[in-house]
């Protein structure tokens, strides 16, 4: 955010505005220019690493642009407590930020502490994200076009074994098993092997070649397929937005059109967004009455299917197509699926979503600082999908489907919010007072329907609808949800003499989600501030331009973790266990009945988080150096947990209770420095760091076994719920002597993982030798931004990082193991890292020997999979040029800027030590959609 005089910056803080200088709470801010850098269809993705204490993670390179936002660590155990999103003053129930055009956003404020967020009460324990969209400005008529084209490609794909390497690895595993376990050599039929036995009787490979044909019909030719190369592509994305705005003293309006097409780097995947927005405002009766509306309509289409997993494990010897042009399987291997077929056959099964969101409002200036506002907001969504699955087979493979079907799904969430406020403003002498009182009523309704039917007469998508299928109907389903909130709230801000600040908030919320015993709760908050720099005794400190102390305490609630209806005992009709021969017939139809889903608890109440904040804001050298440092402590009580199954209660005997407590504390630091603004070469450096430490302080005894620990001697209490728990791997058995001298460990053998006997009883077992081996919580996270400007050129570089966390590297199960029971069946392909596995010819390797026999149980959680998840990424670098006015004036333009940018340029990770990260991206240690490198070329023009 550009640094301006503090008195100019006005911040929207929920139902009212304040000068930034008068803030006593913790608020992070971003404006439209911040969002343009590293622009994305999801605004929060653009802000990753740019706000202290706001931890944003992405879903890799998935074109559907999903993000997860966590403000100041965990606030619940349910995993469902997300920040409340407030759009143009309307709290939302079902808004994903990819649903709206990020180019329409004027500013984003994140309310981090309880004092700031408590005005939203029961839904604010996860923080609050306030979004204001752009409005027309008085006296200005602008036509603005922003457009860009991007090229996306995955540079950091895993390097997999080719066909020959796979064949050699298969032989190596068989030779090891024969020598260590005494098994006989059995090689894959897809290869022709030439081998002999050496003088010591050990199997020695001479040559391996892929068979010319993999099946007896000679329709599947042996190949050397790069499956990653087959499913990945260089993709082109487009982003275009046209905005027209104007205004006068009597009216202001803004109209925008947007189109975003993000083609995925996996074939036949994409995300498209079509958007339209109209924001208007009219002043009537000599400016005593103001009416207006904010309305946005978006239509989304997306296919976010990822087949990275199948591309990684499919044998390279199998081709994509058979000799007749049909889909090929994997003859001679295990049960595999052709990933190109999966992506191609589903390419027209598109997810569709329509979002209509907006509000109408009326402001009435009653008399001398007294005003009233009423606002009615609506948020409607319509999700629908029609999936057509045709008959298919993979030649030579084990997979086929002789049935076709059509499946349809629809869901219609609707929420509306009616907010009424009465405001009073008083400014006299040294006193400034702002008060707001209000009521808010919210209702959410959702209905959904799904159906699937076999027997498509004609496999043509235009024809294939459920109504014209001929098979039996099955998997009919429906869903419904409804709940309401009613709230009373008030807030007062008081400033004395421009330097003593006081704020108080209270909100009382009621929700139909709770039983009558605990339907209402009250959430208060208080905060104070002291602008020390404005004191007389600070006049001699000329180098100090700002110094303010802040302190706050407040309470927030959470209902997001509460499963719908868990205060009552619901019943359901399910496919299994609910149909009975009511008439006693031994044949004929079974009549559908009901079964209990869970046992209700009418005494469930709100999860409540109290939070204390202490902070200092500072500025030096006429605000050229600014920043803030803050500490917070959060305590959440009455956290919802589900108790274990109680057999005597029968089906659904798993009630929810308020039973857990948790503490969370951390530090936040922000700093920004700019050089002399009159210099020809200008630069600004901004950085932020956030930390959080989470500890569970209480769990019911009958629940504690559901969390890491053994439940006997080693408990999660006092630790984060995000810890990892397992055995300690102690290298590889490299000699038979090491095997013989080690503690009793079922399955131990030369070339296998050695586990520590922590309790010293001479036996490695799961009960007494597991311990805490890491945490997914980082030590700190943040980002640093460099902005440079020389004449008409500008350069922006943004680095983002996470440090001190551990990850469970799921890739390692493929890259380090030829076979793991239940996880990595024999026959799958692997990254080339496995070629360096331990063998009698490679005894110094720390990768376990390749084997088809797994008696050492190496798939279990241990430090072997726990690696350092720290990283530093150059997220974005952008070079722009703004044409001088003498050129743009001739072209009847107000502004013209062109730019080129690169996103996801490089990643630095730990590459040394026992806990080094051995895969390619610590941010995504699973098998998801790989993150692409993106080059963007764009144009901003204003008329």
Would you name each region that the model predicts?
Residues 215-218, 228, 470, 511, ...:
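Extracytoplasmic gating/loop element in the C-terminal half of outer-membrane beta-barrel translocons
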Residues 4-278, 283-284, 290-292, 328-329, ...:
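Short, small/polar-rich motifs associated with maturation and membrane association
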Residues 144-217, 449-452, 564-565, 674-776, ...:
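Conserved small-residue
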Residues 8, 34-37, 81-82, 238, ...:
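Extracellular/periplasmic, surface-exposed regions of secreted and cell-surface proteins
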Residues 85, 494, 756-758, 788:
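Short aromatic-centered micro-motifs
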